Design a protein with these regions (language model features):
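N-terminal hydrophobic/helix-forming segments and targeting peptides
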Residues: 1-265
């Protein structure tokens, strides 16, 4: 089954890891994740009609080199998690090709912000399962009951190729994208304006996200308990929901600098 919004068009022949790397623990030996590849019926065996259609996930399988079904289930029982095995690679001039830029880039900058000299009581929540209903955000917001929440994430750039200008949500290399609204939340107007003022006054590259689409952890956080002022700071990412995302390192730095400027103001 698909956990999240992975694009089924890009799955066939992708290398994956099955299970987790587990270190030595309580006297038990270390365990390494299995290598695998996503397979499907060979194209020369498909009908002409089938070749024109995207194969549904139900028609795909993961090949771990097992000789039969029993061996496969012994090594990877039903429910074993599968992740893409995409290495992080610098490309172009200051860009990075990696998996899960949306939203691990936000986790990276949260780790950096842990060292900032913040001027207010600050909690750092590394939430899980955003792609399947922001489940981690609900628990974190219920526990913390924040007054203000900045959501650090990655978002679709859609700026490559011959796209209509109205469909270019944000652009790589133009700075952190600040959202005024999406399908999950509406940014608190004063907070949105303050972040833009901080960015302009500090010379931090920034842009306003130009599409009211998608959703993220801002929705549950804004509506949990007594509610919170929220605003989303996003790093533009190309090809989200795929094994390979592309982001600009200058945009990553801009997200960090703007969040830091707000927390240390």
């Amino acid at each position: 089954r698909n956990i999240g919004g992975v694009d089924p068009r890009v799955l066939v022949s992708k290398r994956v890891k099955v299970g987790y790397d587990v270190p030595v623990r309580d006297g038990k030996p270390a365990q390494e994740a299995l290598n695998g590849v996503i397979g499907a019926m060979a194209i020369h065996l498909q009908s002409a009609a089938d070749r024109k259609n995207v194969l549904p996930i139900e028609n795909l399988y993961v090949d771990i080199g097992a000789k039969d079904k029993d061996e496969a289930l012994a090594k990877a029982p039903e429910g074993t998690p599968i992740t893409f095995a995409t290495p992080s690679t610098p490309i172009g001039d200051g860009c990075l090709l990696c998996k899960a830029g949306d939203d691990r880039v936000g986790c990276y900058n949260l780790l950096r912000l842990l060292h900032a000299d913040v001027t207010c009581d600050t909690w750092f929540a590394f939430t899980c399962q955003e792609e399947v209903g922001s489940r981690g955000a609900y628990g974190a917001a219920f526990r913390i009951q924040p007054d203000v929440a900045l959501i650090l994430e990655g978002t679709t750039a859609n700026d490559a190729g011959e796209q209509d200008e109205t469909r270019k949500v944000c652009r790589l290399g133009k700075g952190v994208a600040v959202s005024f609204m999406d399908k999950a939340s509406i940014a608190q107007p004063e907070l949105f304006a303050e972040l833009l003022r901080l960015a302009e006054g500090s010379g931090i590259a920034h842009q306003v996200k130009m599409a009211v689409a998608g959703g993220n952890d801002s929705g549950p956080i804004q509506r949990t308990g007594c509610g919170a002022k929220v605003c989303v700071l996003s790093v533009p990412c190309r090809y989200i929901h795929s094994p390979s995302t592309v982001l600009c390192l200058e945009d990553v730095e801009a997200q960090y600098l703007l969040a830091k400027a707000y927390l240390t103001r």
